[in-house]
């Protein structure tokens, strides 16, 4: 379950990890979809499952202030989902040259993916059931978050 033909790996079945991090790279929400599901389909789920964050003064807030995303999320409904939740969005535009300004913020997520894939159980999916693989993914995210506490 939650596997589909991977467009990168010659059509072999695979799955895709989705993650939302804070500015330090600590994972806040993780998700799992089939490899052939587009990234933008998972954005609303990820935004709905964000935990309440604390601001600098220690008061809990209901949502993050800003969202940085790559060109895979450049669709009107992704921007509307952020606006409806009062989140400022900085999404790279499709068809335009890649901006180094947004890259300063997005490398944090790529580093977090590298931290997740240090756990070899997540690098290659051995589990048949998606709930078990998602449990390992959540456990790895919790261990990464625990390391920074």
Feature map (PLM): residue ranges:
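Polybasic low-complexity intrinsically disordered regions
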Residues: 1-94, 101, 140
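Basic, amphipathic alpha-helical segments enriched in Lys/Arg and hydrophobic/aromatic residues
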Residues: 76-80, 85, 89, 99-149
């Amino acid at each position: 379950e939650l596997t589909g033909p991977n467009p990168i790996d010659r059509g072999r079945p695979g799955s895709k990890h989705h993650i939302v991090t804070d500015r330090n790279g600590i994972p806040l929400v993780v998700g799992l979809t089939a490899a052939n599901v587009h990234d933008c389909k998972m954005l609303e789920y990820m935004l709905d499952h964000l935990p309440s964050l604390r601001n600098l003064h220690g008061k809990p807030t209901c949502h993050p202030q800003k969202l940085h995303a790559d060109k895979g999320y450049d669709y009107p409904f992704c921007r509307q989902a952020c606006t409806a939740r009062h989140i400022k969005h900085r999404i790279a535009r499709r068809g335009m040259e890649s901006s180094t300004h947004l890259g300063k913020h997005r490398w944090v997520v790529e580093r977090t993916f590298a931290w997740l894939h240090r756990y070899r159980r997540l690098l290659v999916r051995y589990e048949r059931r998606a709930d078990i693989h998602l449990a390992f993914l959540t456990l790895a995210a919790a261990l990464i978050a625990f390391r920074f506490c």
